[in-house]
């Protein structure tokens, strides 16, 4: 963890008082499960906390930055900023991917490069930083790492297929859109999900992905392509 501590201090001017929090943030469940006798904590609880503080800080930023935008527009932009792929990208930008502790099976299957794991890692780090330093330090870190990309308009170019599908269908009248998991295959470290998108309980299309969120986006993308051919 010494190299990680040096990275945080040199790149972001962050120094943890409670080193155990930092280590927990970078410990995946697969590693903790393989070392049960050591009673090692993993990062899922910190991820929960980090997700909450990230949503709050980004919401506050968008509210202040875009006084004329509607609630719907701000929600759409926020969802692209905090989506799995975006957070995984920030983990890579910060070089966090080099320091996460993974189980042997997860490591062999490419877990170090998986968006789901890296996105969760970024949130877990925020949770640990919140507990160790407080919300203003989390805000400072996000202002350094995330906000510059927001201000460059990076996320306004990202397609949220679920939102696009919802807007298209609801423009034609009130409809109920639902996403249902059809199948879940593969070992825990390499899951593959198949999801169907239903409109008023009728199946419109299907999609696949390494997580439920990615499979839902793929299903919505396929539905939009299908509707464009009608």
Curated annotation (Swiss-Prot):
Its EC number is 3.1.26.3. Mg(2+) binds at residues 47, 120, 123. CDD domains: DSRM_RNAse_III_family (cd10845), RIBOc (cd00593). Keywords: Cytoplasm, Endonuclease, Hydrolase, Magnesium, Metal-binding, mRNA processing, Nuclease, RNA-binding, rRNA processing, rRNA-binding, tRNA processing. It holds the Pfam family Ribonucleas_3_3. GO terms for cellular component: cytoplasm. It catalyses: Endonucleolytic cleavage to 5'-phosphomonoester. Its main location: cytoplasm. It is found in: Cytoplasm. It comes from the Bacteria. It is an enzyme of class 3 (hydrolase). The active site is at residues 51, 123. HAMAP family: RNase_III (MF_00104). NCBIfam families: RNaseIII (TIGR02191). Belongs to the ribonuclease III family. Digests double-stranded RNA. Involved in the processing of primary rRNA transcript to yield the immediate precursors to the large and small rRNAs (23S and 16S). Processes some mRNAs, and tRNAs when they are encoded in the rRNA operon. Processes pre-crRNA and tracrRNA of type II CRISPR loci if present in the organism. This is Ribonuclease 3. The gene is rnc.
């Amino acid at each position: 963890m010494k190299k990680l501590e040096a990275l945080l201090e040199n790149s972001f001017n962050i120094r943890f008082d409670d080193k155990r929090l930092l280590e927990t943030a970078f410990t995946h469940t697969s590693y903790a499960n393989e070392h049960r006798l050591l009673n090692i904590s993993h990062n899922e609880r910190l991820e929960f906390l980090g997700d909450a503080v990230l949503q709050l800080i980004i919401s506050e930023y968008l509210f202040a930055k875009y006084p004329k935008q509607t609630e719907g527009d701000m929600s759409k932009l926020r969802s692209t900023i905090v989506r799995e792929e975006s957070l995984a990208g920030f983990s890579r930008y910060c070089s966090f991917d080099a320091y996460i502790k993974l189980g042997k099976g997860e490591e062999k299957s490419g877990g170090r490069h998986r968006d789901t794991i890296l996105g969760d890692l970024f949130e877990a780090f925020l949770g640990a930083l919140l507990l160790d330093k407080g919300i203003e330090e989390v805000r400072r870190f996000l202002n350094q790492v995330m906000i510059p990309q927001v201000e460059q308009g990076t996320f306004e170019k990202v397609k949220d297929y679920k939102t696009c599908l919802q807007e298209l269908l609801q423009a034609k009248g009130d409809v109920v859109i639902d996403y249902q998991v059809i199948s879940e295959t593969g070992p825990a470290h390499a899951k593959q999900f198949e999801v169907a998108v239903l409109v008023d309980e009728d199946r419109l299309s299907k999609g696949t992905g390494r997580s439920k969120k990615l499979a839902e986006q793929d299903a919505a993308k396929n539905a939009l392509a299908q509707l464009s051919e009608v």
